[in-house]
Amino acid sequence: MSRKPFIAGNWKMNKNPEEAKAFVEAVASKLPSADLVEAGIAVPAVDLTTVIAAAKGSNLKVAAQNTYFENSGAFTGETSPQVLKEIGTDYVVIGHSERRDYFHETDEDINKKAKAIFANGMIPIICCGESLETYEAGKAAEFVGAQVSAALAGLTPEQVASSVIAYEPIWAIGTGKSASQDDAQKMCKVVRDVVAADFGQEVADKVRVLYGGSVKPENVAEYMACPDVDGALVGGASLEPESFLALLDFVK
């Protein structure tokens, strides 16, 4: 089963619209062929319309970093998935460990968001990952498996097959520590095996599983060599055009 590699940058809460536009203009014409690899960037809500306009006609996909699960209503400060679709958003990141930790998002919240994203014709990038404590206790597979099952509950097999699931060990995010190649492969296979158990092997063979956690141009190729790693969700190394483009060099 051939799955197209996907390198997705996550700017987190960085860049104003002017800086965001300059970034897209610097990378848009230099991206590899969309037949070889999918390139995307998850940007702050205030940058979305600017980035979508600047990326038009290029191979760059645009992701929101979060959404609410209702399309409209009295939800002050939230972002409508319906409006995200209307402005041209391709993907939505949900369940990032920073959202789970700082904003107390639950597996149930993330599942509702996944359903809302699909209902509005976009694709979720569903994040999962364990703490250092869970990892050292030898419970990473059990913990991450439960997160994945909960996030996908009630979705159709077709929806799950088109989903992107990003495994990010919390202890490796922004710390400079990264999981070994063996750890990344083992845990991305855990994710795929959970999908197979819940939705069947055919669906599991289609879902794209990304690794995230201190991925850099220097180590991306070793992760991409793993059979169950289909791409990367990248934080700090996606902030500069040169570094972002270098992440895509593994396809050469």
Swiss-Prot record:
Q: Where in the cell is it found?
A: Cytoplasm
What cellular-component terms does GO give this entry? cytosol
Give a yes or no for keyword Iron in this entry: no
For this protein, the Enzyme Commission number is 5.3.1.1
Top-level EC class as recorded in UniProt:
isomerase
What does the record give as the reaction this protein catalyses?
Answer: D-glyceraldehyde 3-phosphate = dihydroxyacetone phosphate
**Record-linked SUPFAM superfamilies:** Triosephosphate isomerase (TIM)
Query: What PROSITE patterns does UniProt report for this protein, alphabetically?
Result: TIM_1, TIM_2
Q: Locate the active site.
A: H96, E168
Q: What's its job?
A: Involved in the gluconeogenesis. Catalyzes stereospecifically the conversion of dihydroxyacetone phosphate (DHAP) to D-glyceraldehyde-3-phosphate (G3P).
The subunit structure is:
Homodimer.
Protein's name according to its UniProt entry: Triosephosphate isomerase
Species this protein is from: Streptococcus thermophilus (strain ATCC BAA-250 / LMG 18311)
Q: What is the lineage of its organism?
A: Bacteria, Bacillati, Bacillota, Bacilli, Lactobacillales
